[in-house]
Amino acid sequence: MASNSTPKYNSNSLENSLRRSPGDGMNHEQNDEIPCLPGEALITDKDVIYMCPFYGPVKGRIHVTNYKLYFKGEEMEPLISFSVPLGVIARIEKMGGASSRGENSYGLDITCKDMRNLRFALKQEVHSRKQIFEDLTKYAFPLSHGLLLFAFQNEEKFPENGWAVYDAMTEFRRQGLPNGQWRITFINKNYELCDTYPPLLVVPYSASEEDLKKVAAFRSRNRIPVLSWLHPENQSAIMRCSQPLVGMSGKRNKDDERYLDIIRDTNGQTSKLTIYDARPNVNAVANKATGGGYESEDAYPNAELVFLDIHNIHVMRESLKKLKDIVYPNVEESHWLSSLESTHWLEHIKLVLTGAIQVADKVASGKSSVVVHCSDGWDRTAQLTSLAMLMLDSYYRTIVGFEVLVQKEWISFGHKFSSRIGHGDKNHADADRSPIFLQFIDCVWQMSKQFPTAFEFNEHFLITVLDHLYSCRFGTFLYNCENIRDKEKVREKTQSLWSLISSEKSKYTNPFYTKELNRVLYPVASMRHLELWVNYYIRWNPRIRQQQPNPVEQRYMELLALRDDYVRRLEELQITNSPKMNSSTTSPSSPSQIMPQVHTPF
């Protein structure tokens, strides 16, 4: 049975996980030696030698379940043990062959999606590699073997339903929609207009359903410009869409041109609509050869086009590979800065943040509606709109608000999580894989470092989100769009990650958070102010980990607990003295006359 205690996910450094039994806090059922989730079953186990890059060879036993790989060491004090959700595994390779003669040269190499690699050596004479290789491959890549992802087998129960966090109509109403300029359309309720958009869309009030269909025919994958966010005061809008289908011949579409004019007119405060094309100019021009393109000045005289120079998914994938090479397993101190620079990872983070700042500033200060797109409108577009909304709207900086932001801008609007992450798929070399959502979370972390009191959630929250981006324990990030999720009945058959978060919110809460309404955040996106997220990218290396937990945060939490204890004792004293107050014939002028003073440090 699942316990009522909140599941936790271990995101501490490798040293912490190595030097103790796995206290990852999940809803555990004991299965002899290994901790299991409800619905998790042991598949196989074998004696192995873990080739630890930090402590050397460790004898132990590997256990494979339908959810995770679990290693438990032997003959070593303290105990070395760790677990890896199978969804985190990107590739499994055989190491060595029948002719291998070196010690520990025969076994398995496992490449993970979370910046670590694992190597296990086995004895050749036992012939145990074949079975464990086949079992690992089968359950790490279930979709490639006709099996269900673990999320559909997970039997965990939580006190709160995370699927209820986001309701499109509720979020629209929070933004003051519909109103005289904007309406909610049900044209996509059966995914007939655009199969990768959500069922409910917000469009200009004066645009008819027929107009929307004509515009869809001129936008890549029918992803028309629709509203993401509306400024509560100046009524400027953030719109998102895909590229226009201009092609080499420079095709035009009067309906699309008129539609963008209608968007410009909705707030009536600027003479031009700003279109932010996330791509480098040269890439946008090159896309004409495949039927795409961009909005030319001739066709859209009332629009200003700005290219943001953010590179495509392939460049980002290669950049992350280079970053992994320099952070795992060893960090070379003597060339660290030049090595980090050569990955270009922070440069890409800078460009994404810079683009989002431009979008936010144009809406808030320029009082202009904006249209944001890349090629298909589900990668760089999602990064820009969600980050700009995070800067503009303090609601999205709360825990629930951030969950709504992710559900809305990423999940409902069709970021291809399945393709970008490769859930349950053995094709590790798939060109569609790319760390787009990781970049977004990295940008959020950069903002939280610059504004430490502005976000209700803490770093542990962000790491937990990334861990379960890969784990396949929850249904939240599965599949490419809502259309497919509905067909697979994800909400009915799986648990939401937000259920886990809601179950013990205090673990994910920033103790320094100060609620501020209507404060716009403009982070500094220069290279001097950006940092490598060590607690995520290098967390598996015990030699280069930051102090855990943060001593200032820990002390603050202790003071908060002390304050809560004082408040509790004060309430108990009030209850104890209540009968005396009621029976007294003379009413004291203040509670202090009948109650002992309780002094707190606050």
Curated annotation (Swiss-Prot):
Residues 1-32, 574-602 are annotated as: Disordered. Belongs to the protein-tyrosine phosphatase family. Non-receptor class myotubularin subfamily. InterPro entries: GRAM, Myotubularin, Myotubularin-like_Pase_dom, PH-like_dom_sf, Prot-tyrosine_phosphatase-like, Tyr_Pase_AS, Tyr_Pase_cat, Tyr_Pase_dom. Pfam families: GRAM, Myotub-related. A 1,2-diacyl-sn-glycero-3-phospho-(1D-myo-inositol-3-phosphate) binds at residues 287, 312-313, 375-380, 420. The keyword Membrane applies. Its EC number is 3.1.3.95. It comes from Xenopus tropicalis. PANTHER family: MYOTUBULARIN (PTHR10807:SF69), MYOTUBULARIN-RELATED (PTHR10807). It comes from the Eukaryota. The GRAM domain mediates binding to PI(3,5)P2 and, with lower affinity, to other phosphoinositides. It catalyses: a 1,2-diacyl-sn-glycero-3-phospho-(1D-myo-inositol-3-phosphate) + H2O = a 1,2-diacyl-sn-glycero-3-phospho-(1D-myo-inositol) + phosphate; a 1,2-diacyl-sn-glycero-3-phospho-(1D-myo-inositol-3,5-bisphosphate) + H2O = a 1,2-diacyl-sn-glycero-3-phospho-(1D-myo-inositol-5-phosphate) + phosphate; 1,2-dioctanoyl-sn-glycero-3-phospho-(1-D-myo-inositol-3-phosphate) + H2O = 1,2-dioctanoyl-sn-glycero-3-phospho-(1D-myo-inositol) + phosphate; 1,2-dioctanoyl-sn-glycero-3-phospho-(1D-myo-inositol-3,5-bisphosphate) + H2O = 1,2-dioctanoyl-sn-glycero-3-phospho-(1D-myo-inositol-5-phosphate) + phosphate. Keywords: Cell membrane, Cell projection, Cytoplasm, Endosome, Hydrolase, Lipid metabolism, Membrane, Protein phosphatase. This is Myotubularin. Residues 28-96 form the GRAM domain. It is a peripheral membrane protein.
